[in-house]
Curated annotation (Swiss-Prot):
Gene source species: Populus euphratica (Euphrates poplar)
Protein name: 14-3-3-like protein
Task performed by this protein: Is associated with a DNA binding complex to bind to the G box, a well-characterized cis-acting DNA regulatory element found in plant genes.
Family as reported in the entry's similarity comment: Belongs to the 14-3-3 family.
Domain of life, source organism: Eukaryota
Length: 17
């Protein structure tokens, strides 16, 4: 699950921009 959270955070940053 931890791995998924890390990927999710990366996607959030990309979407924010």
């Amino acid at each position: 699950l931890a791995e998924q959270a890390e990927r999710y955070e990366e996607m959030v940053e990309f979407m924010e921009k």
